[in-house]
């Protein structure tokens, strides 16, 4: 059933929940998540947030129950492959890959085990909560194996005698190390993504989605950019600009107290490292300020 309000599914709890909510708030969507409520209404836009389990989000999109969803690509692809195998709807539109929620699905083995490549996994029993992604990879490399399906605590499976290896999400590798495991193969790299259901939308929803996407782009650009202010010798301006790749043409203003220097203001999309600041100083720049940017719109 379609409504006039834009319905967005986000993870109720977990690694993507806070960052998805924070992104929406930075885009100007006002809402207040309280208690165990499953539906939260925006205070200033015709938007409803559905707080659900992450593995339910792809299905809600593919069945057309909600309009948009924030989801990890690993969960999205696992559900897509599963629904495709079952003959269920599995189509969606990927609107934007986001800059958070990065992880990888990896096969891990005993830390003392020698490993020379995927062929060493032949005949092994591999524990995972992502059987479809694991099967897709093992089929691609042509290695036979068996699956031990678990819903949690996958990393303990080898020590418990349930499996020879595991396929699980890895961020830093600390959990693997704590359980005597090492990463052998990366089989899927993932980030958070914003997806949309297929089908028609009315004009108001199309306009609202476009507004959100534009604002998300602005938030992401701002996160990747810095506002730089400095004083510089006028004759060194070209050399200073060359040290700041990714910068637009700067705003250059005369200094009232020193006619030989100018004030330079610019936005740079590159990280400004200490070495660069030291090089700027060597060229005669002073009062160098590097500031974060909250929002941008081109």
Curated annotation (Swiss-Prot):
This is ATP phosphoribosyltransferase. Catalyzes the condensation of ATP and 5-phosphoribose 1-diphosphate to form N'-(5'-phosphoribosyl)-ATP (PR-ATP). Has a crucial role in the pathway because the rate of histidine biosynthesis seems to be controlled primarily by regulation of HisG enzymatic activity. Feedback inhibited by histidine. Its EC number is 2.4.2.17. Transmembrane segments: none annotated. One of its GO terms (cellular component) is cytoplasm. The keyword Magnesium applies. Its cofactor is Mg(2+). It catalyses: 1-(5-phospho-beta-D-ribosyl)-ATP + diphosphate = 5-phospho-alpha-D-ribose 1-diphosphate + ATP. Disulfide bonds: none annotated. It is found in: Cytoplasm. Belongs to the ATP phosphoribosyltransferase family. Long subfamily. One of its GO terms (molecular function) is ATP phosphoribosyltransferase activity. It is an enzyme of class 2 (transferase). SUPFAM superfamilies: GlnB-like (SSF54913), Periplasmic binding protein-like II (SSF53850). Keywords: Amino-acid biosynthesis, ATP-binding, Cytoplasm, Glycosyltransferase, Histidine biosynthesis, Magnesium, Metal-binding, Nucleotide-binding, Transferase. Gene3D superfamilies: 3.30.70.120, Periplasmic binding protein-like II (3.40.190.10). The keyword Metal-binding applies.
């Amino acid at each position: 059933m379609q409504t006039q309000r834009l319905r967005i599914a986000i993870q109720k709890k977990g690694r993507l929940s806070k960052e998805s909510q924070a992104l929406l708030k930075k885009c100007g969507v006002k809402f207040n998540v309280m208690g165990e409520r499953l539906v939260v209404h925006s205070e200033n836009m015709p938007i409803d947030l559905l707080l659900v389990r992450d593995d339910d989000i792809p299905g809600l999109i593919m069945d057309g129950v909600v309009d948009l969803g924030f989801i990890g690509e690993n969960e999205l692809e696992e559900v897509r492959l599963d629904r495709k195998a079952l003959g269920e709807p599995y189509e969606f539109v990927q609107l934007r890959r986001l800059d958070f929620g990065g992880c990888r699905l990896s096969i891990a083995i005993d830390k003392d085990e020698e490993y020379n490549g995927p062929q060493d996994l032949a005949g092994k029993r591999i524990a995972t909560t992502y059987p479809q992604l694991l099967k897709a990879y093992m089929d691609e490399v042509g290695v036979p194996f068996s699956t031990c399906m678990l819903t949690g605590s996958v990393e303990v499976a080898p020590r418990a005698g349930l499996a020879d290896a595991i396929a699980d999400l890895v961020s830093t590798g600390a959990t693997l190390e704590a359980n005597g495991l090492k990463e052998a193969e990366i089989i899927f790299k993932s980030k958070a993504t914003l997806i949309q259901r297929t089908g028609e939308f009315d004009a108001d929803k199309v306009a609202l989605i476009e507004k959100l996407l534009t604002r998300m782009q602005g938030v992401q650009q701002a996160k990747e950019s810095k506002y730089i202010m400095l004083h510089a010798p006028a004759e060194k301006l070209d050399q200073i600009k060359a040290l700041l790749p990714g910068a637009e043409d700067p705003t250059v203003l005369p200094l009232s107290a020193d006619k030989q220097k100018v004030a330079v203001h610019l936005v740079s999309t590159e990280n400004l490292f200490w070495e660069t600041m030291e090089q700027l100083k060597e060229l005669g720049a002073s009062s160098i300020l590097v500031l974060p940017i909250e929002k941008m719109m081109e």
